[in-house]
């Protein structure tokens, strides 16, 4: 038996229930993993609230979470990439990471290097790999650019601050409070804009001598859309990598009127395939961590049983950096 969080209807954090679940033996191509830490990501909130539809069969509901680290307890027939005793992490497993033990496809597992603890790795899998694909694939940064990054003090944001600094990129980051601004700056964000008291477009124009930026990474969505577009240089790129304030709907004529802008809504799934490529991404991330260029530790830790409270904290915007669960 394993303790796991399940939910049977969409709604607030109160729909999350801690239950006992049966965990069987892994089948062909599968592995059983005992979790040491589980990561919270805002996409978990989207699934819980129904913004991202998820099947909730009557009577069985669904697990939650796709990002965790742990140790391989057993492997099924045909599994060669991992073995019993391996420390592993994953970021795009089937829903169900909010659990003590689970069975999942072995192909999603990423071996962890000895120099990175499970606790650190739990903050890196989804969030660090997100920074990798945004900065190295969606809009490959070469160094020397000045960029705008929204929510710079969040879980992905603090890693992005450090990655930008390592690349020689000047990051302008938006934050909601002065305290979060200090945290972002301490992690390598060159300029912070405190949105509760500063005008985003005005400050970006001041910082860039009126030029604007070539790319905006916007995980907020509805509330920052127009500001993001107005901060871009002609032919600039708007990367919509999240919609925490609401979905974004953009008329193509608006992109033309704002300067022949480009827009993309990337999804992690399309940037981590095939498996060999995912492992290369992870190696680049781990190399930065092992070299000390990226430092990542959880800023908030909750017991698995307190997953609902962890969701409340995440949604309240009171947290900075990464939040993890301990099973």
Label the model's feature ranges.
Residues 156:
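Hydrophobic/small residue at the entry helix of a nucleotide-binding pocket
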Residues 57, 66, 74, 88-153, ...:
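NAD(P)H dinucleotide-binding glycine-rich loop of Rossmann-like/cofactor-binding domains
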Residues 275-327:
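C-terminal hydrophobic helical "lid"/dimerization subdomain
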């Amino acid at each position: 038996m394993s303790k796991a969080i399940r939910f049977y209807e969409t709604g607030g954090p109160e729909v999350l229930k801690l239950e006992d679940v049966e965990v069987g033996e892994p089948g062909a191509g599968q592995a059983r993993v005992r979790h040491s830490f589980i990561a919270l990501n805002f996409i978990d909130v989207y699934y819980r609230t129904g913004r991202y539809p998820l099947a909730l069969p009557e009577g069985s509901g669904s697990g939650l979470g796709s990002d965790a680290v742990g140790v391989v307890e057993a492997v099924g027939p045909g599994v060669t990439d991992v073995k019993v005793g391996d420390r592993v992490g994953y970021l795009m497993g089937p829903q169900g990471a909010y659990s003590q033990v689970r069975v999942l496809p072995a192909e999603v597992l990423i071996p962890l290097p000895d120099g990175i603890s499970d606790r650190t790795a739990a903050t890196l899998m989804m969030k660090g790999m997100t920074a990798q694909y945004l900065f190295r694939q969606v809009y490959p940064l070469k160094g020397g650019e000045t960029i705008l990054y929204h929510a710079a003090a969040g879980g992905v944001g603090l890693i992005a601050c450090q990655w930008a600094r390592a690349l020689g990129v000047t990051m302008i980051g938006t934050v909601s409070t002065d305290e979060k601004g200090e945290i972002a700056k301490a992690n390598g964000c060159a300029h912070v804009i405190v949105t509760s008291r500063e005008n985003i477009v005005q400050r970006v124009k001041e910082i860039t001598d009126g030029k604007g930026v070539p790319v905006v990474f916007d995980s907020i969505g509805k509330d920052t859309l127009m500001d993001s577009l107005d901060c871009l240089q002609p032919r600039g790129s708007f990367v919509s990598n999240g919609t925490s304030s609401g979905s974004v709907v953009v008329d193509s004529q608006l992109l033309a009127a704002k300067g022949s802008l480009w827009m993309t809504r990337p999804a992690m799934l399309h940037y981590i395939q095939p498996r060999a490529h995912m492992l290369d991404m992870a190696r680049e991330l781990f190399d930065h961590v092992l070299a000390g260029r990226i430092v990542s530790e959880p800023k908030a830790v909750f017991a698995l049983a307190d997953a609902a409270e962890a969701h409340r904290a995440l949604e309240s915007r009171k947290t900075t950096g990464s939040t993890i669960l301990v099973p």
